[in-house]
Amino acid sequence: TTKSSSFVMMICVLLIMLIIVPLGLPADRTLAAVTVHPLATKAAEKAFKEGGNAVDAAVASALTLGVVDGFNSGIGGGCFMLIRKSDGEFIAIDGRETAPSKASRDMYLRDGIAKSELSQTGALAIGIPGALAAYNLAINKYGNLDFAKLLRQAAMIADEGFLLDDSYLVRLKKVVNKLRLFPASSRIFLDSNGSPWPKGYRLKQSDLAKSYRNIANHSVDWFYKGPFALKTEQWMVLNDGLIVHEDFISYEAKRREPVRTTYRDHEIIGFPPPSSGGVHLAQILNILENFDLFSMAPDSSEFVHIVTEAMRLAFVDRSYWLGDADFVSVPRGLASKKYARMLAKKINLSKVASINVHSIPEDADSDLF
């Protein structure tokens, strides 16, 4: 089933903040899992009970979220995974979507005018999905459980269905008009009149279950090199899309070095580019470190002003510098303490600064992510 809401499609962002538990630890270990849906949380708990570690639990919950929270998660999109091993090592796995090989700068222009809808709905809005590759890499390198087993467990939920609640329906109603554009999606998420299913309806997704089982039986190659990729190319041809079979074949999730900084006595670990979160969280905190925030009330105008200005400085840099480090130059200096001290001097405590142009960190053309 093809669903599309933006170029990002359905992003599953996984931030693993649990210690990965090695094999052989006592059975009374303390474990925790938190997700946005009870069934996904139960999937994580089940993974723990079967001897899995935090990576296994995260992947189990992510696969389940692909069933019960498809607005935000799913193997049709991408994800970032930040993992801390029990020995203290941090690993960042980049499973973000990539653009098709045929993508071009002007692909969303028509008669020289940008058409935003083309980047939000339809064949041109879709990137090469990376979540599945990231899950597979994480499980194979850092997990204890069999990926196929986790896929089959999530497939059971897709087959048996789950009850729609108010939260799901609020989001479903927002995309009804877009779902109606795609018959395969309409058949699943809308009734015969093209209206959303009511609260309490048991939503079953047999196609998704079948896909999960095919991946379990034939590995991720079924998705990236076999029938799924070929079927996607066929759909793209019929719907003026750009993705071809070779785009799936060439996709791979990547291990990257996390962004590390400190804020006063705390170490902060963030995700590197193509995510902007880690870089600019570090930048904002580094700027704020130059001010005595502890002497201010959190709701005071002074506190709010300083934090706002720090964020403005970071976001103007983000607009200019940030991108996929495989294709553009992203300076490491954005997250440096020295650069933050320079930016902090631009903050006027008595008025809003004019921040219209990005700043330039030291060695911006050579010290890169």
Regions flagged by a language model, labelled:
Residues 277-279, 283, 313:
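Extended, domain-scale alpha-helical bundle/helix-rich regions
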Residues 25-42, 46, 54-225, 229-272, ...:
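Noncatalytic scaffold domains of N-terminal-nucleophile
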Residues 1-5:
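N-terminal secretory signal peptides that target proteins for export/translocation
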Residues 10-22:
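Bacterial N-terminal signal peptides
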Residues 226, 284, 366:
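Extreme N-terminus nucleophile/cap motif
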Residues 285-291:
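Active-site proximal helix-loop segment of RNase H-like, two-metal nucleases, encompassing DDE(D)
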Residues 291-369:
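Internal maturation/activation junctions in enzymes
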